[in-house]
Amino acid sequence: MRFDVPRLVLAGLGGGCGKTFLAVGVVRALRERGTRVVPFKKGPDYIDAAWLSRAAGIPCRNLDVHLAGEAAVVRSLVDHGAGMPKRAGGSVAVIEGARGLFDAMDETGKTSTAHLARLLSSPVVLVVDCTKVTRTVASMVLGCRMTDRRLRLAGVVLNRIGNARHEANIRSAIADLCDLPVLGALPRAAAAAVPERHLGLVMPDEHAAAEESVAATAEVVARHVDLDALLEIAGRAPSLSAPRAPRTPRTPRTCRVGVVRDSAFSFYYPENLEALEAEGATLVFVDATRDELLPEVDALYIGGGFPETQADRLASRPGFARSLRAAVEDGLPVYAECGGAVYVG
């Protein structure tokens, strides 16, 4: 079957160029205009995905070819993007890339953002850090275009622009060398008003002003980026071919699986929780920083996170820790990973 999914990939030349800032701002700004936005993050990253979830108001899905395979990645985009209800403001899937456009696990570029964009036949918008450069920006953009002509490179967003002359010089160079539209220019001063350093480094739940940061980011992006042009580019993406999703029979609820989800343990992929429910589990969410005791459950899932930053809060619940230890010693099945494994250990 073929599915229509308006979509675009926001990519960069490297880490720290402003991809997450732009992606979070675009997602929230479009949402505030009435557009139905479904966010995706290339790769396994939890933190960027959490900020995108906060911006969109719905879970962000990770698209990782290495972990899930190409077919599952396409299926995820179709399952969560093609079913978007029609709205007056339209609908769009926004996919944030990772690292540089062509950076991957090996020298072939497989698993790169470029590989993902080709797999999904998605237009690519390149965000470029313009700090202390002018015409060189155009040469870097041209290099990306020439490295892989199969890419649907559709435009550029300039980040950290110093002044009007700086912007004009770069726009002129890109027009001369690249024949690509500049879709926006984010001033260095405007971006500095938002704690950009936290985006991608700190989970929203640990950020004292997460909502204010997302709102401020959206305001900057809405003022300096052509959102209508982004939607038009996303709408040019061709339909995607994918098999019909298999029907999953409803499984009777047969067990209670505790999931420790709080400020210390927050690294969960929604697909894993959905898979547990599909197999008949009733999920019981637990907060190790607030609950006095572990509730009655048949199994326990403790995901990753940053328990070291919440050590005081975890230590303030000795009764919870004792009840967990007693349950484990009594044979409770526990699956723990990353920070969860550290806590249990």
What residue ranges belong to the model's regions?
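Beta-strand->loop->alpha-helix junctions that form or flank phosphate-binding loops
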Residues: 41-42, 180-190, 282-289
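Residues that mark the start of a beta-strand
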Residues: 7, 35-36, 254-256, 282
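Helical hairpin unit composed of two closely spaced alpha helices linked by a short loop
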Residues: 292, 297-300, 343
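A short helix->loop->beta-strand "cap" motif at the edges of active sites that frequently abuts
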Residues: 122, 180, 329-333
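Glycine-rich phosphate/diphosphate-binding loop of Rossmann-like nucleotide-binding domains
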Residues: 255, 259-292
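Internal gly/pro-rich beta-alpha loop/helix module
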Residues: 134-249
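Cysteine-nucleophile active-site neighborhood
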Residues: 307-345
